[in-house]
Amino acid sequence: MTKKEYKIHIIGAGISGLIAARVLENHGYHPIVIEATDRVGGRVKTDIVNGYQLDHGFQVLLTSYPAVQKHLDCDALELQSFLPGACIFKSNDQKTIGDPLRNLSLLIPTLKSGIGTFSDKLKILKLNQKLKKKTLEAIFLESEQTTLEYLQRLGFSNAMIKDFFKPFFSGIFLETELGTSSRMFEFVYKMFGEGHATIPKSGIEAIPKQLLSNLKTTKFNYNTKVESLKDGKIILENGTQLESHYTIVASEASGLVSKLKNQSIEWKSCTTLYFETDTRVINKRLIGLISKSGTLINNIFYNSSLESATTPLKEILSVTVIDRRGLSNESLIEVVRTELTELCGITATSFIKLYNIPRALPKLQDLKYEMMPSETRLTDHLFLAGDTQLNASLNAAMISGERAALGVIESITSIV
């Protein structure tokens, strides 16, 4: 059997599935991707609404991710960079902090901010140096504790944790108690320190679109839902059965594979709301954090502070809510508007769109950075991919997709 005669199916056209297809193509195979929706991207999507570029959730691309450097053409994405810092809204005031070693304009605001003690600032410098010397593999071999325990053991003040670490990393981890593994904290902190947080000029969906554009021999079946996988067959929701020599599941597998039915993934959710405003209250390319406990809003960002492929007529503001507390969309919009006014001094907002994202990030235990291709194999002909296999990051999604494809290739070559 020639390479192109192998029927290799990939279920899911998210980042992992697209990377798997790319690796298979590079080795001479012609994979078939089955996607339930009408386009690639999975959770990485962008809409154009009334001339505004709206990502599905507040998502950034970290340029320091090794897998990003390997698989993406960052220049072609025209990445728009955030400044390395944050604007913190506290007690009806606005404070700016950041890394003056990377952007000198943040030096004076940081010194004047009153956020954290002098000792906290020294501890941040020490943490920066520690993680600079630490490999990613070493980070994921450390014993796990919660991020909160980790920060407390490093001696950061309660105020520093409350005002900066909690709102900033709650927005990344999508949980408000910093209960996420310290491995993930060290990994993300190191990646932020060694590169830039960015958004492609055309929105976050430019990432899967670029991966798609590089595929030449992969076939895509959109709007096609898989019911189950059994004995080398893919059974579609409409009853059609597809023969498959090898299948990579690059979506949640528990509902498709009988032996995984009791191992479903738990997910973290979030809600992102977009508003149109006349002016900005944050004049730099910085995320805005709410330090007050008990608020709905976790963070805000003026997307219009970065250059985009569209030309918005007014300022566009994104608001991230981690726990909407069961509120209806209408009630949520009203409470968020009230908080924007009371906490940030933002008035005269015009609502554009709301994205409720029930499966924003997977809840994972025993986080890993890497895996062998053989570790992606569930059965002789079935392989698993996705960030759920390693850790909740775009980097992990790419690595797992590559490893699953290599696992398939190893299986084929071992029997040839």
Descriptions of predicted regions:
Residues I15-S16, V40, S400:
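Hydrophobic/small residue at the entry helix of a nucleotide-binding pocket
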Residues N50-K130, K134-A138:
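Dinucleotide-binding Rossmann-like beta1-alpha1 core, especially the glycine-rich loop
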Residues K126-G232:
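Active-site/ligand-binding neighborhood in enzyme catalytic cores
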Residues A309-V416:
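Conserved flavin/dinucleotide-binding core of flavoenzymes
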